[in-house]
Amino acid sequence: MVEAKLILTLFHILGTVLGVGGATMAEIFFLKAIRDGVIDPIETSFLRTTYSVIRIGLFIIIFSGIGYLLLYRLTGVDWYLLSDKYWAKMSITLIILLNAVLIQMRSIPMWLGGAISLTSWYFAMFLGIWRGLDMTFSEILGVYVAAVLIVAYVLHLIKKIMCERYKKCKI
C-alpha cells in the first residue's frame, strides 16, 4: 500500500503544480492581454493553452483524490475522511470545478472567476501542505471566502493601475 500512496501523492502534487501554476499564469496573461483593451488571437491562444493546463491539473487532482479516498477507505484510515480539513479540500475542489464550468460557459464575470480560480488553487495547496491545521470546516471556509474577496480586490487594483497607465482598457 505504500507504493500506491506514493504514486497517488506524486500525481496529486503534479495536479496541484499544474493547477496553481496554470491559475497564476492565466491571471498574468489575462491582465497583460486586457491592458490594450483588446484580446488579440495570440493572447487568446496563450489563454486557451493555460486554461487547458489548469483543466489537466484539475483532472489529475480529482482522479488522484478518488484514489486517496479508495485507499483510505480500504486501509481503514476513516478518521481522515471525517476530518474538517478533508471536507474543506473537497469543497474547494468542487468550487474549482464549478468555477471552471461557469467560466467556460461565460456565466461568471472574469474578475470573479479569476479571483476564485487563483484563490482556490492556492488555498487547496496550502491545505495540502499545512499538516497541523486545527480549524473547523466553517473556519476554513470563512478564511477562504475572505481570501477570495481580498484577491478579487487586489486584482481589481492591479487592473485599475494598468488601465490608468495604458489608458485603453476598461475597469
Describe these PLM feature segments:
Residues M1-I171:
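Polytopic transmembrane helical bundles with strong interfacial aromatic enrichment
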